[in-house]
From Swiss-Prot:
Subunit relationships: Component of the nucleosome remodeling and deacetylase (NuRD) repressor complex, composed of core proteins MTA1, MTA2, MTA3, RBBP4, RBBP7, HDAC1, HDAC2, MBD2, MBD3, and peripherally associated proteins CDK2AP1, CDK2AP2, GATAD2A, GATAD2B, CHD3, CHD4 and CHD5. The exact stoichiometry of the NuRD complex is unknown, and some subunits such as MBD2 and MBD3, GATAD2A and GATAD2B, and CHD3, CHD4 and CHD5 define mutually exclusive NuRD complexes. Interacts with HDAC2.
Organism of provenance: Rattus norvegicus
Gene: Chd5
Residue numbers carrying N5-methylglutamine: Q1388
Protein's UniProt name: Chromodomain-helicase-DNA-binding protein 5
Cell inner membrane as UniProt keyword: no
């Protein structure tokens, strides 16, 4: 760090220069001697020694004072030497301080670095003469101080501090205003001059300077001694090589620098302190190269502790760089480097400072307090460290050593032998720090050699290049023994006796050089590798056995035996094998694939860039012309021939290069014709000449395919070649492209995109069928592709910009290739280059990759410039017509561009038309042939489904998985689709093998080699037990097997199994790439191959792989998508197969697998029919319900085993008999005679008789019998029949022959669902498991809930009864039931009754969920018209009552339905209503079309109708059923409400909900309740409710609770605000009530209440209670009016009447009633004037006839009273319209009042109050203020009128105040709606998702599992409603059964 002294760095330099000039030792005198200590006396000098100073960055050699000088003017020679030393010098300078002060070093690092840079700059720029003090003063305009120093001054001013104190006052006196910085600079310059002029330099300073000068000249430094400049060392004649006494490995190895530094600091008994001069220039004196060498050897500190270090002797690049970086550390011959600051801590100045041993501080002696006369001896800590208590801790080997007669040589060499790591007498290398024992060298040395000795590392020859990889190693012969040349000097007594001189063998490594081909591989010594590729060498050591050379690795895969035979026959092969092949180099790697490019060197010689076979492009290498490689000349000729062909004559082979080429001219490629020579529309009867020349022969159907493709090309029709897998689509495509080329139609280029795994196969086929094509495979990593782009795309060097980044190709550049083969991924990744080329033809293999037009592949490929497109696919219809449409859209977007139109066109016509029309569309575009048509003699294939039992271990895990996931499975817990999928995957794993779970895998017995123990592996899985028996028999019979599994981990287990069984096998999965994959296939298909099994993963093994040598396929676990399985077994059943193929599909009985297989079969049925998008897609569209059904399959039986304890002990397993059935049924059991007696659940007939399946030898033999009938999948055949019309390319499409037998085509079948299935099955197991877990976790035993198992068994029985009708489809109670019409307590009898009603229909199965009949979609048997009629009925009457089927609710269109079908449809309809999702979607989740259903409107209507119905029921028992007394039959009141309700047999009437048995249907009130209740109050606008997920829910109580909460946050003020808005709008706007309709929708509560109470449902809590804070007159009026009304009725009609709607005065209804009744009573026209009575009968009419059926109501004699008020208007023309409008408006008002009543009822029951700080309350306070102000100043108006002027003035002020208050209130009112807090959605209030709420509400009312706390406790929702909301008591349950029934009735 520079001090304030500007030129501080220059200060000591001049001081040192003087000393140097006097005492410098010349290079000649020094003579390059290193035995420095021989030339100096041993006695110590009086003063502490001051060692020469190396720069502060050089490492510390010991504690000593130091000064430094440097020569200002170096000779050129010296500068050269300096440069040389800098490049060769080492950075190895051991330091003591480094370790001790690591922390401080880090802090100082940045400072030092900056300082180093400054110094380097200084050095680089040459040495500048510092300015003198006079110059500085003159420059700054200061007065100089001319003071002559006397001798005394020179004696007294011995340090800078004293000098400064003396001179500073003098300068300040002359220059009073001198800045401090300039003062310090001048003082520095003065001190420098003073020191330079000091005549007394011969004393201590002189001694120190001499030492500095001498030491800087030498490199090996002795302990510091004062010498006189006169002493000149004499050169020695010859010297022995350097030796030293090392330390053994037992000695603690310290940092080498620390050890050496102590020796160097020990010139005296007392170690001198370290001194340093701040800021001394790091320029060093010149030194000879020899002197630098020991310094050089210090290179690598780490090398001391490691056996292998980079060569310190070679001037390698890395070392130069390193030296340059650390140049400052080695500049001075021998200083030391410390981390100390270079200025005094006290005065911040440089100079001679002493360094603290325990911290980085430094001090002047005079700056210490107290001052020190001289440096203290030994270790010294500064005042700061002493204060902090930090002490220097001595190290073990810091003890002072006794000094001998001569000084110890200072040494940087290793303390131990590099080979054996032991101490003793060591031979030291003169060029590096290595040390060796003589006997450890190879060969050993007999004695210490004379002169300079370099170690093996320094004499090791450099490598010829960079090593890319190590291929092999071997032992070499020992080196020849070392011959002793000169007699050695005396051996030191410590040397061990010499060993025998034989050398030891060394390792040699066979290496591949980077940038060179395998032809250049060679052997290198171990030491070379160790020195130049340390990391690679170490890694190789770590991974390989370094005692025994690796066995020979024949990379070609040949066995030793084969190799020997070939060597005997082929001497060239023998030579190559010995030199290359045995070391793992494949012969292909040394064969030229093709020459890519050429270049000329300066001499004009040509070099070729060669691509080697089977190696990627990034391993291309440049080779010279003359290298001897087989076929090299031919390939050169081919290269030049291709250039000539593409570029013309100019590009032919240069004449000077023509050598052997002349002989090869005849092989030149034939140029394609420029014009077409053959008409492509003419058919070939036999294959063309250019195919004959390849030696191949096309099958007749392939020739037909070629003709069809050429014809389509001529017509410009893009095509799909859809031949079945295995018919050679690849060959037909290649021959087609080749024909275009050879016949002159097109020269390319052609783009072929294929899956990566098949690209190698494409290459081979191109080589075979199109030899003249130049085919480039564009795959690989970035480097490889970069090489391809630069060399294979064009002949021009600059056609494409080089580098890894992809650029476009220049326009109109000659393309080099004919065909580019690439993968799907690179089409998108390297779009820039590929998209810039104009392609003559595009071929996409496995084109179903284009089935989604949203995929990137589709979009990118669509943007390419392509003349003609050809798609290849074996499965053109994988899932649905939508995918086929996308293929056609890709082919011809101008023709196929309207997806909706396409699908619609094929959705509404019958199948025959559809097929015909599709054929007309597809005919020109698609050709499809089947193996069955093409190869009449091709062996058949038989597919058998083999049902397998779970092993005991699998059963344990299967149960565990279900139990552990009970909460996710139990729909009440709200399990989602993802979690169900996860559970299903776990169960599939369990069916495969329990070891797929980490827990089981860890516990499994293992073999020493890490694989599983075979016997336990087999016993753990039922499938493996069967596989073991099957494989044994198959092997004996000579069959070969393919085993497919989806899971690669399962393939790992199968590998262990096959190893255990001793079978040889191959394996392919997603991780095995193209090359390795093809090799494995080739090995398996090779004649006489030993491999018996081939393991494949279903998806990776499904593409373009030919394994026709196998004849047995075992599908270990089925894929979700059946097409993947078909592709899998088509690997074996293809061209070349000459045996019958047996396919065994393993399916675990009664498990998810069995169900999945059935679902997969159903998907296959969709393949040839489905045209609805989305219905047939893959697992993505699995609904939660489908997943749930799959998971349930077989579980009951599994857990029944637990309960029954496997009761079937008396039955012994018998031999299974394979029943080979068609797989159409989905469950073909190659099964067994089965034990009978089990009755598994579900409707799967296959399983019903089955129990444990046991396979014995007889069963296995039967299973493997190949004479069984072929059972090709019928669905598959159907699909193929559908596509069969494309099998003959006659250019006109044949019509479909088949006729559809079945009238109804099943699209989708609804699954049966029991809501409580998991609850009953798993609850007990789950609780037990939780208890065990809690006990294990130390939570104590759970208190068991008392369960009455009798009840449970009854419930179970009931459940079974319910399911007895095939689990009737409408029992989807969990999500679809509605409680509006269900009354749980009395439900049992109702249930039995309904069961009796159902009996007749029980045997008749329900129609399928979705079917197509005559082109029209049916849903559960309801056609479009019936569905519309059902919806209209819902919109008219609300929810169907529970006994709707017996009432006349059923309209004419629905009367043909059975009750079972009707109920199922109601259930489905409600489920759809409650399904969340956008109304805009085309279908519901299960695929049923929405048909424009607006969920919000329907739910709103259901809600409104429910409120109306309940209000009428409330008063029905009083008012009867007739509006006028003369119509009433006798004693109508005597009838029960239920009877009263449906009176007119001709009119459909909803039955009273109170009567209904609990069935899974209804949802009316529930929905109403949920429907829009929450947000509507504040705004007059209707909003669709998010909380409407109401699914028909079976638990009345639950729903009530939830709903309550749901409504709970009402308040008076909100209501008041409603009044303000609504009262104004109620009559005027017909829409407004609609808005309110939604409110009722949310009020299920009342309904539910009806359900729970079988009596009249008067659930209206006292209105006044609700209005505590703001009592309204209306309420009292209401009661009074009712009383009056009652009296009048008695008088007038003796007819009792009661009706009220307690709207709390929030609507105008009561005001109207009051006025109307007053008028009616006063005039006596009780019937003629419309009032309360009419309103009641209007509502009753709506309940009977439906919503807004005004005319029907008026025509009904029961409601005659409604016509009375209009009699006087009959004569008017618009009489009817007027009457209907009035009724509609009046109904809206009633509707509004009903909504508010329901809200108030809930608010009252929940004791809700409004926060006094709420804006609404503030408005109330303002109103009171206005009233108060007005009343208190009433008298003013009289006085003012009386002429009182002061009163008049006051009156004006008061009026102003009132005006202000009123305007404020007006402003507040307008803001009020937005300020009133809206009720949050029910989901937010309950803190649950909509799904969770719905599933929670699915519990049945009597269900003991209802957990009330979840809904009852107010904590759940208290905080949602603000601070002042009070719930129904402290955590109590909202139970509406406890509420008062109906206080709003008059006449009691």
């Amino acid at each position: 760090m520079r001090g304030p002294l500007g030129t501080e760095e220059e200060l000591p330099r001049l001081f040192a220069e003087e000393m140097e000039n006097e005492e410098e030792m010349s290079e000649e005198e020094d003579g390059g001697l290193e035995g420095f200590e021989d030339f100096f006396p041993a006695e110590p000098v009086s003063l502490p020694k001051k060692k020469p100073k190396k720069l502060k960055e050089s490492k510390s050699k010991g504690k000593r004072k130091k000064k430094e000088g440097s020569n200002d003017e170096l000779s050129e020679n010296e500068e050269d030497l300096e440069e040389k030393s800098e490049s060769e010098g080492s950075d190895y300078s051991p330091t003591k301080k480094k370790k001790k002060k690591l922390k401080e070093k880090k802090e100082k690092k940045a400072k030092r670095k900056k300082r180093d840079e400054d110094e380097e700059d200084n050095e680089d720029g040459g040495l500048k003469e510092p300015k003198s003090s006079g110059q500085l003063m003159a420059e700054w305009g200061l007065d100089d101080v001319d003071y002559l120093f006397s001798e005394d001054d020179y004696h007294t001013l011995t340090n800078y501090k004293a000098f400064s104190q003396f001179l500073r006052p003098l300068i300040a006196k002359k220059n009073p205003k001198i800045p401090m910085s300039k003062m310090m600079t001048v003082l520095g310059a003065k001190w420098r001059e003073f020191s330079a002029n000091n005549p007394f330099k011969g004393s201590s300073a002189a001694a120190a300077a001499a030492a500095v000068a001498a030491a800087v000249e030498t490199v090996t430094i002795a302990p510091p001694l004062a010498i006189s400049p006169q002493q000149v060392p004499q050169p020695l004649p010859v010297r022995k090589a350097k030796t030293k006494e090392g330390k053994g490995p037992g000695v603690r190895k310290k940092n080498k620098g620390a050890k050496d530094s102590k020796k160097k600091g020990r010139g005296k008994r007392v170690a001198g302190l370290k001194f340093r001069f701040g800021g001394i220039s790091k320029r060093k004196k010149g030194s000879s190269s020899e002197e630098d060498e020991p310094e050089d050897s210090d290179l690598d500190n780490a090398s001391i502790h490691s056996s292998s270090v980079r060569s310190e002797c070679s001037a390698a690049l890395g070392k130069k760089n390193k030296r340059r970086r650390k140049k400052k550390r080695i500049d001075d011959g021998d200083g030391y480097e410390t981390d100390h600051q270079d200025y005094c801590e006290v005065c911040q100045q440089g100079g001679e400072i002493i360094l603290c041993d325990t911290c980085p501080r430094a001090y002047h002696l005079v700056c210490l307090d107290p001052e020190l006369e001289k440096a203290p001896e030994g270790k010294w800590s500064c005042p700061h460290c002493e204060k902090e208590g930090i002490q220097w801790e001595p190290k073990d080997d810091d003890e002072e050593e006794e000094e001998g007669g001569c000084e110890e040589e200072e040494d940087d060499h290793m303390e131990f032998c590099r080979v054996c790591k032991d101490g003793g007498e060591l031979l030291c290398c003169d060029a590096c720090p290595s040390s060796y024992h003589l006997h450890c060298l190879n060969p050993p040395l007999p004695e210490i050699p004379n002169g300079e000795w370099l170690c093996p590392r320094c004499t090791c020859p450099p490598l010829k290049g960079k090593v890319q990889r190590i291929l092999h190693w071997r032992w070499t012969e020992p080196p020849a023994p070392f011959m002793v040349g000169l007699p050695g000097p005396e051996v030191e007594p410590g040397m061990p006796p010499p060993r025998p001189l034989e050398g030891i063998p060394e390792r040699e490594f066979f290496v591949k050089w980077a940038g060179l081909s395998y032809w250049h591989c060679s052997w290198v010594k171990e030491l070379q590798l160790e020195l130049y590729h340390t990391v690679m060498y170490r890694n190789y050591q770590r991974k390989n056995d370094m005692d025994e050379p690796p066995p020979f690795d024949y990379g070609s895969g040949d066995e030793d035996g084969k190799s020997e035979k070939r060597k005997n026959k082929d001497p060239l092969y023998a030579k190559m094998e010995e030199r290359f092949y045995r070391y793992g180099i494949k012969p292909e790697w040394m064969m030229v694939h093709r020459i890519l490019n050429h270049s000329f060197d300066k001499k004009g010689d040509v070099h070729y860039l060669i691509k080697w076979k089977d190696l990627p492009y990034d391993q291309c290498t440049w080779e010279i012309d003359e290298i001897d490689i087989p076929y090299y000349d031919n390939l050169k000729q081919t290269y030049w021939g291709h250039r000539e062909l593409m570029l013309g004559e100019d590009a032919r082979l240069p004449k000077r290069l023509v050598k052997k080429g002349k002989k090869l001219k005849d092989d030149k490629q034939e140029k394609p014709p420029d014009t077409p020579i053959v008409d492509p529309t003419v058919k070939f009867d036999k294959q063309p000449w250019y195919i004959d020349s390849t030696g191949g022969t096309l099958h007749p159907y392939q020739l037909e395919g070629l003709n069809w493709l050429r014809f389509s090309w001529a017509q410009g029709t893009d095509t799909i070649l859809a031949d079945e897998m295995g018919l050679g689509k690849t060959v037909q495509t290649i021959v087609f492209l080749y024909s275009l080329y050879k016949e002159g139609h097109s020269k390319g280029p052609y783009l072929v995109s294929a899956p990566l795994s098949t690209i190698i196969n494409w290459e081979r086929e191109f080589e075979m069928w199109a030899p003249d094509f130049y085919v480039v495979t564009y795959t690989g990593d970035k480097e490889s592709r970069s090489v391809i782009r630069e060399n294979e795309f064009s002949f021009e060097d600059n056609a494409i910009r080089g580098g890894k980044k992809v650029f476009r190709m220049k326009k109109e550049v000659q393309i080099k290739f004919h065909v580019l083969l690439t993968s799907y991924e690179l089409i998108t990744i390297d779009q820039a280059i590929l998209g810039s080329i104009e392609w003559a033809c595009l071929v996409v293999d496995e084109a179903h990759r284009l089935k989604n037009n949203q995929s990137k592949f589709f979009r990118v490929l669509n943007s390419y410039k392509i003349d003609y497109k050809l798609l290849l696919t074996g499965t053109p219809l994988q899932n649905n017509l939508e995918e086929l449409f996308h293929l056609l859209n890709f082919l011809t977007p101008e023709r196929f561009n309207n997806l909706e139109g396409f699908l619609e066109e094929f959705a509404d016509i019958s199948k025959e038309d559809q097929i015909k029309k599709l054929h007309d569309l597809l005919g020109p575009h698609m050709l499809r042939r089947l193996k069955a048509d093409v190869f009449k003699n091709m062996p058949a294939k038989t597919e058998l489904i083999v049902r397998v039992e779970l092993s005991q271990m699998q059963k344990k895990y299967y149960k565990f998985i279900l139990t552990r996931n009970f909460e996710a499975l139990n729909s009440k817990g709200g399990g989602n689709q993802v979690s169900l999928l996860n559970i299903m995957m776990d169960l599939k794993k369990c069916c495969n093998h329990p070891y797929l779970f980490p827990v089981a895998a860890v516990e499994a017995p293992m073999l020493p080699n890490g694989s599983y123990d075979g016997s336990s592996l087999v016993k753990s899985s039922g499938k493996l037990m069967l596989l073991q028996k099957m494989l044994k028999k198959l092997r004996d019979e000579g069959h070969r097997v393919l085993i497919f599994s989806q899971m690669t981990k399962m393939l790992d287990l199968l590998e262990d199994f096959l190893e255990y069984e001793g079978y040889k096998y191959e394996r392919i999965d997603g991780g095995i790439t193209g090359g390795l994959r093809q090799e494995a296939i080739d090995r398996f298909n090779a004649p006489g191959a030993q491999q018996f099994c081939f393991l494949l993963s279903t998806r990776a093994g499904g593409l373009g792989i030919n394994l026709a040598t196998a004849d047995t396929v075992i599908i270990y676990d089925s894929d979700w998508n059946p097409h993947n399985d078909i592709q899998a077994f088509s690997r074996a059943h293809r061209i070349g197969q000459n045996k019958k193929v047996m396919i065994y599909r393993f399916v675990t009985r009664a498990s998810v697998e069995e169900r999945i297989t059935q679902v997969a079969k159903r998907k296959m049925m969709l393949t040839h029919l489905v045209v609805r998008p989305g219905l047939g897609s893959k697992s993505g569209s699995m609904t939660k319900q489908e997943l749930d059904d799959i998971l349930k399959f077989g579980t009951e039986e599994l857990f029944k085993d637990d309960v029954e304890g496997m009761m079937s002990q008396g039955q012994r397993p018998t031999t299974p008999i394979p029943d080979v059935q068609s797989t159409k049924g989905g469950s073909l059991a190659a099964g067994a005679k089965k034990k009978h007696g089990g009755t598994p659940p579900g409707d799967n007939k296959d399983v019903e008789d089955s129990s444990v399946i046991h396979y014995d030898d007889a069963a296995i033999s039967k299973l493997l019998d190949r004479n069984q009938d072929a059972t090709d999948d019928t669905e598959l055949q159907n699909m193929n029949e559908y596509l069969s019309s494309f099998k003959v390319a006659q250019y006109v499409v044949r019509e479909e022959d088949g006729v559809e037998e079945v009238e109804r085509e099943v699209i989708k079948q609804e699954e049966n669902v029991d809501p409580d299935y998991w609850e009953k099955l798993l609850r007990h197991h789950y609780e037990q498991q939780q208890e065990d877990l809690a006990r294990n976790l130390g939570k104590g035993k759970r208190i068991r809930k008392q369960v009455n198992y009798n009840d449970a068994s009854q419930e179970d029985q009931e459940w079974q009864d319910e399911l007895s009708d095939n689990q009737s489809e409408y029992s989807i109670g969990s999500e679809d039931e509605d409680e509006d019409f269900e009354e749980r307590p009395e439900g049992q009898s109702g249930r039995r009754q309904s069961r009796r009603q159902l009996k007749s229909d029980r045997d008749k199965p329900l129609p399928p969920l979705l079917a197509r009949v005559g082109g029209n979609i049916e849903v559960l048997g309801f056609n479009a018209r019936q569905r519309k009629a059902f919806l209209n009925a819902i919109m008219r009457w609300g929810m169907p009552p529970q006994d709707a089927f017996n009432s006349h609710w059923l309209v004419r269109d629905l009367r043909g339905k059975s009750e079972k079908e009707f109920r199922a449809y109601v259930s489905l309809f409600m489920r759809h209503l409650c399904e969340p999702g956008a109304d805009g979607a085309e279908t519901f989740a299960d695929g049923v079309p929405r048909e424009g259903l607006s969920r919000q409107h329907v739910l709103t209507r259901i809600g409104v109708m429910s409120l109306v119905r309940k209000k009428v029921q409330e008063f029905e028992h009083v008012n009867g059923k007739y509006s006028t007394p003369d119509l009433v039959p006798e004693g109508p009141e005597g009838k029960k409400p239920g009877e009263v309700i449906s009176s007119d047999p001709n009119t459909p009437v909803p039955a009273s909900p109170a009567q209904l048995p609990p069935a899974p249907l209804g949802l009316p009130d529930k929905m109403e309740a949920q429907l829009g209740y929450t947000d509507e109050k504040e705004s007059g606008t209707q909003k669709p409710k998010k909380s409407l997920e109401i699914q028909a829910l079976p638990t009345a109580l639950d729903r009530v609770e939830a709903e309550d909460k749901h409504q709970s946050s009402d308040s008076k003020d909100r209501a008041r605000e409603e009044r303000m808005e609504e009262v104004e709008k109620a009559q005027g706007s017909p829409e407004q009530p609609l808005k309110e309709e939604t409110l009722p929708d949310k009020e299920p509560v009342p309904d539910k209440l009806e359900l729970s109470l079988s009596h009249s449902n008067d659930f209206r809590p006292d209105d006044p209670k609700a209005e505590e804070k703001e009592p309204t007159e209306t309420q009292q009026n209401g009661d009074r009016e009712e009383d009056e009304e009652g009296k009048k009725e008695d008088k007038n009609g003796k007819f009792k009447f009661m009706f009220n709607i307690a709207d709390g005065g929030f609507t105008e209804l009561h005001t109207l009633w009051q006025n109307e009744e007053r008028a009616a009573v006063s005039s006596g026209k009780i019937y003629e004037i419309w009032h309360r009575r009419h309103d009641y009968w209007l509502l009753a009419g709506i309940v009977t006839h439906g919503y807004a059926r005004w005319q029907d109501i008026q025509n009904d004699p029961r409601y005659m009273i409604l016509n009375e008020p209009f009699k006087s208007e009959v004569h008017k023309g618009n009489y009817l319209e007027m009457k209907n409008k009035f009724l509609a408006r009046r109904f809206k008002l009633l509707e509004q009042a009903l909504v508010i009543e329901e809200q108030l009822r809930r608010a009252a029951y929940l004791n809700m109050t409004q926060d006094p700080n709420h804006p609404a309350m503030a408005l109330n306070a303002r109103l009171a203020e206005v009233e108060c102000l007005a009343e208190s100043h009433q008298h003013l108006s009289k006085e003012s009128l009386a002429g009182n002027k002061p009163a008049n003035a006051v009156l004006h002020k008061v009026l102003n105040q009132l005006e202000e208050l009123l305007s404020d209130m007006k402003a507040d009112v307008t803001r009020l709606p937005s300020m009133l807090s809206r009720i949050p959605p029910v989901a937010a209030r309950l803190q649950m998702s909509e799904r969770s709420i719905l599933s929670r509400l699915t519990n049945r009312a009597g269900d003991p599992t209802i957990q009330q706390g979840a809904f009852g406790s107010s904590q759940m929702y208290n905080n949602s409603f603000g601070p002042n909301f009070r719930g129904p008591g402290p955590g109590g349950i909202v139970n509406y059964n406890q509420m008062p029934l109906g206080p709003y009735v008059t006449g009691r």
